[in-house]
A protein has these predicted regions:
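Glycosyltransferase specificity loop/lid
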Residues: 1-295
């Protein structure tokens, strides 16, 4: 086991606990695993129990060698319907407020475990940016599961607040034509209207949870992460990625990766995540990639 732990990079992957976030993070985790990484995938206890009821006992330990599941609480009381979808704003607020401590405890347990390689990196959902608030001694990358256009839009939520576009004065602004206000100052999105931006801007609440989280994500979480992962590349989303770089000048992205051949016989050796990253910040912080559907 000593030789195993010395050579195999170990990435902890933590998605936001909603289906549209779990699936992309799980896909990325499986792709990393196929390239030689040891993976710890972190679910919330509530979602893990739902998966166990759906797929049967032992599902989390069956199948892939070097791919394990761990759980942390989400901080919410269990709903009366054990299969119900949780309220997203409440879940966002709760994970931000309560998940760092149990995640820290999990990282400590992994560091003491003799049967797993040392953790060499963390890939966190962009909506779980509390992971950048702690010095875990390894790079923390944020994976934003929405499009590059969505990411670039989120980067401007704070400026929309500062310029007075949002929160709305009252609910009449939802129907009086105000949402058709042109927003012509976002580079790459010059011909959009307020209604075309993420729906969080339509709130009338100055303390809106989702609005606050989006502002913090762009102002604090992304700049403090080792990098940002987007499922795209320059040839596809060049203007949006140029905009993201202008917001975070320490970040860049590689050119479009070539699509792997299904019959490729290239060795599945570990790539450079974790093992060759000397600190928690790199110049090439935005990572673009092609996610082939192989699982």
């Amino acid at each position: 086991m000593a030789a195993f732990t010395e050579i195999r990079p170990h990435v902890v992957v933590i998605p936001f606990p909603a289906q549209g976030h779990i699936n992309p993070l799980l896909k990325l985790a499986k792709l990393l695993h196929s390239r030689g990484f040891y993976i710890t995938f972190v679910n919330t206890e509530y979602n893990h129990h739902r998966l166990t009821r759906s797929r049967g006992p032992g599902w989390a330990t069956a199948g892939l060698d070097g791919f394990r599941f761990e759980t942390i609480p989400d901080g919410l009381p269990p709903p009366s319907d054990e299969n119900s979808t949780q309220d997203v704003p409440a879940l966002c607020a709760s994970t931000r407020a309560t998940c760092l401590a149990p995640f820290r405890d999990l990282m400590a347990r992994l560091s003491r475990a003799a049967d797993v390689p040392p953790v060499t990196g963390i890939v966190s959902d962009g909506a779980m940016g509390f992971t950048v608030d702690e010095d875990f001694g390894v790079p923390v990358l944020l994976f934003f599961t929405h499009s590059a256009c969505g990411c670039w839009s989120y980067c401007h939520i704070g400026e929309l607040v500062r310029r007075g576009y949002t929160p709305l004065k009252d609910e009449s602004f939802l129907t009086n034509g105000y949402l058709d206000t042109p927003i012509d100052w976002i580079v790459g999105l010059e011909n959009i209207r307020l209604r075309d931006l993420p729906s969080f801007v339509r709130t009338t609440d100055s303390d809106d949870v989702m609005l606050s989280i989006m502002v913090r994500s762009a102002a604090h979480d992304a700049p403090h992460a080792a990098g940002i992962i987007l499922n795209t590349f320059d040839d596809l989303d060049g203007p949006m990625l140029d905009g993201i770089r202008s917001k975070f000048p320490n970040l860049s992205t590689p050119s479009a990766p070539s699509r792997p051949s299904p019959s490729s016989s290239s060795p599945r050796s570990p790539v450079t995540f974790g093992r060759k990253i000397p600190s928690a910040r790199r110049d090439d912080g935005v990572v673009g990639g092609y996610f082939q559907s192989t699982y």
